[in-house]
C-alpha cells in the first residue's frame, strides 16, 4: 500500500503566501494588543464624570489644548456647525425670554427678529448648520439692540446664557465666509457628550489616559465599563447650578442631583483605591449669581451669610461629607473655559495625588 493511503501527508502543513501573511498579521495584532494592554496598565487613568452641562467636556477639550497639539484646521472646522447651533440656541432663548417678560422691540429690531425666525423655519439640516453672513449680521443687530441687552442683563441667570454671550458678542466674526473656529471658540462651545471619549497624553513625564463619558442620565449606565483600574475620579460640579432645576427631572435641584451622583460614585467599592478630585466649576458664574440669588433660597439648611466664602465653604462641606478617606480627596474651584486656570489646577491635583501616594508608600515625608 502506498504511503499516501495510510501515511501522514505533509501537504496540509504548508501555508500559502496569503495564509503566511495573515498569520504574520495576526501575530502583529496580538503583539499590538498586548502592548496596548501593558501601556494602559502603566498609564495614570482618570475617569472624568459629572452631570450634563457641568463643564466636564470643556475640561476634556482643554487637556487636548494643553497636552497635545490642539486642533488642526480640519479638526477645528468640525466644530463650526456646533458653534453656529450654540448661537442660534442663545438668540432663540433670548427672543423667547423677551416674549415671556413682555419686553418689546423697536420696529426695525422686530423685523430682524422675524427674519431670524424665518431662517430657523427653513432649516433642513440642523446637524450641518451654517449661518449665512446676512443672517449673522441680522442676529448681531438683534443682540446689540437695547431691548435684547436689557433682557440679557436682567434675565441671564434664568436662561443660563453667560457662556453664549461670548459667541453673541462675536457673531459677525463667527459667520464670516472664511471663518475657522479658534481654540477659544472650541473651548467655549457647548456640546453634549454621548458615548465614551478617550485621550492619552504626557504631563511632567507621566503618561495619562483620560476617559470622558456622557453626563445625561441615559449615558450614566455606560460608566461601569470604564471602572477598571481607575487611579483618579475627576468629578465636575457646576457651582452655578445651585439654584437651577435638573432639566431631566424638574422635581430636583441640579446641584442636589449632582451631589447624589457624587455620593454614589465615591461609595462604589470599585473606587476604593482611587483618589477623588472634585472640581467646583463655573466658579466665576457662581460668584456673580450670588449677588441676585441667595444660596439660602435653594438650600434651607444653609444658615450663613450670602458672601462668596461662606457659600463656597458650605458647598465644599456638603460634598466632603460623602468622603471617608480624607487623605485621598482634593477639591478645587475652577473655570473650565480658562485654559490657564485648568492648567494650574490640574497640575496641582496631580501633584497632590502623587505626593499622597508616595507618603502612603513611606517614600515621602
UniProtKB/Swiss-Prot annotation:
Residues 334-339 are annotated as: G5 motif. Residues 277-284 are annotated as: G4 motif. A lipid is attached at residue 2 (N-myristoyl glycine). Residues 42-364 form the G-alpha domain. Transmembrane segments: none annotated. One of its GO terms (molecular function) is G protein-coupled receptor binding. One of its GO terms (biological process) is adenylate cyclase-modulating G protein-coupled receptor signaling pathway. GO terms for cellular component: cytoplasm; heterotrimeric G-protein complex. G proteins are composed of 3 units; alpha, beta and gamma. The alpha chain contains the guanine nucleotide binding site. Belongs to the G-alpha family. This is Guanine nucleotide-binding protein alpha-6 subunit. It comes from Caenorhabditis briggsae.
